[in-house]
C-alpha cells in the first residue's frame, strides 16, 4: 500500500504538513503529528506551510498541540 503522506512530501517539497482543506472549519484544521514532514515537531506559535493534493499551499499558525492532534489556524 502506498504511503500517501510520504508521496505528498516527495512532490511538495515546500510543505510542512499534509492536510485536507475540505475539513476546514472556521479557518481551523485538526491534523495528526504523523501528518507533518518527518523530523518536524510542531510547537504552539509555529507557522507552518499546509498543503493538500491539488490545492495551493497555505500558511498556518499552530495554536494547540496535544498527544493526539495539532490544531492549526489558516493565515492566508
Describe the function of each predicted region.
Residues 10-32:
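Short, basic/aromatic beta-hairpin or loop at an interaction surface
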Residues 36-38:
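Short, conserved secondary-structure segments in the cores of folded domains
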Residues 40-43:
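Short, well-ordered loop/turn sites that connect or cap secondary structure elements
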Residues 56-66:
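Short beta-strand-centered aromatic/proline hotspots
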Residues 67-76:
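Short, solvent-exposed secondary-structure boundary/capping segments
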Amino acid at each position: 500500500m502506498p504511503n500517501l503522506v510520504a508521496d505528498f512530501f516527495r512532490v511538495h517539497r515546500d510543505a510542512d504538513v499534509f492536510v485536507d482543506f475540505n475539513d476546514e472549519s472556521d479557518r481551523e484544521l485538526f491534523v495528526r503529528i504523523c501528518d507533518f514532514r518527518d523530523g518536524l515537531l510542531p510547537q504552539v506559535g509555529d507557522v507552518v506551510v499546509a498543503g493538500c493534493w491539488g490545492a495551493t499551499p497555505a500558511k498556518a499558525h499552530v495554536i494547540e498541540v496535544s498527544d493526539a492532534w495539532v490544531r492549526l489556524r489558516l493565515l492566508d
